[in-house]
Amino acid sequence: MKIDMRNISKSFGTNKVLEKIDLELQSGQIHALMGENGAGKSTLMNILTGLFPASTGTIYIDGEERTFSNPQEAEEFGISFIHQEMNTWPEMTVLENLFLGREIKTTFGLLNQKLMRQKALEAFKRLGVTIPLDIPIGNLSVGQQQMIEIAKSLLNQLSILVMDEPTAALTDRETENLFRVIRSLKQEGVGIVYISHRMEEIFKITDFVTVMRDGVIVDTKETSLTNSDELVKKMVGRKLEDYYPEKHSEIGPVAFEVSNLCGDNFEDVSFYVRKGEILGFSGLMGAGRTEVMRTIFGIDKKKSGKVKIDNQEITITSPSQAIKQGIGFLTENRKDEGLILDFNIKDNMTLPSTKDFSKHGFFDEKTRTTFVQQLINRLYIKSGRPDLEVGNLSGGNQQKVVLAKWIGIAPKVLILDEPTRGVDVGAKREIYQLMNELADRGVPIVMVSSDLPEILGVSDRIMVMHEGRISGELSRKEADQEKVMQLATGGK
């Protein structure tokens, strides 16, 4: 199948989101679609798959003009879109999810369970996965649920599969399994549109890359003929060396110290961070970094160990106690643990600091609104009206709201777990700049990240974990990717 999208434009009211887009897609090729949040990537694919029509332009499939009035029509034609937020029903079984809306019935109008099971098992076999059909899909990992979404696409004659940030919530092992499946589908002649911010994945898995910016296509190239520096510059108009802003903060005395901390999946963890210092925590998935931070913050129970702030030992058995002690914690899962998506920006930003706006039994709403608007302006949160629901913001702006929430308590120490996960390159740099400004004010920052270039580009000092223990410490000067990975895999 060959798809030609010609002169595609799209406006929502007066807001023009796509302008005169030309894009070619081909079966048997893996085509990356890159760009900052809001560049128009998902909108373009939603037009292709019939979620909404283009304002102008034409789509040709194998030379014939064609449009789809809904995604189901596109799927029946062989074009499927797996969105970042997967379309599954947690309480329903795997089999029920696979055939929801496409049930196979007997001549008597009853569900043909035997044929549906047969087709489901054939799709799983094609993907090289084994998943029970009769358990609730909510009991499965994100990686397994993603395989079910791909299997759902295979129930029709699949020609083009669009995937939006497919590895955002996957473990390293699940990511490798996904890549195996993608390569297998490519060999079968399926074309893949791979929407991602992750440079290393683009170069590992794709044949072509198209860069979008502000609703237009900037360039399309064979992936092997470009590099990270060129792609970043095309996406945001900056070179890669400008990606990590310079840090000039003066590093002071030790402000936060953890000694011999033991908990679930880790033991004997000790480290310190100074005023104005950014301490990076690196390691492979499952090394225990997140568990350490959750235990410090009182989410998980510690078995033993001490935590000190400004040389004073503190006791923390709950997140509310941690907040009272001046610890802020941006979790790796912002949507489930960091934000209340139905709440507006103002309510989310002031959740930990609501009491600060109460005086003599009266709530000072005017002061709270002014405070929130200052944070919105300072963090460059787009469409940032205080009364706007957080669920309507992009990933990068949602992450800024979580950061603002903790800045609002004037933290004595700030813990950031995967602070730029799922965030586009432009928003990433803004977050790095904000971290530097907090460090300039003397705030000690602990940053957990699985992005090795980020660890090397942002940290003053790096702790590396392996299988629940600290395996080494590196200064910024001596650290490089090889040394960090050696420690992360248990080497010395």
From Swiss-Prot:
UniProt GO MF annotations: ABC-type D-ribose transporter activity; ATP binding; ATP hydrolysis activity
Gene Ontology CC annotation, any one: plasma membrane
Top-level taxon of the source organism: Bacteria
Pfam families, alphabetized: ABC_tran
Membrane association type: Peripheral membrane protein
Protein localization: Cell membrane
Keywords annotated in UniProt: ATP-binding, Cell membrane, Membrane, Nucleotide-binding, Repeat, Sugar transport, Translocase, Transport
EC id: 7.5.2.7
Major enzyme class: translocase
Protein name, UniProt field: Ribose import ATP-binding protein RbsA
Encoding gene per record: rbsA
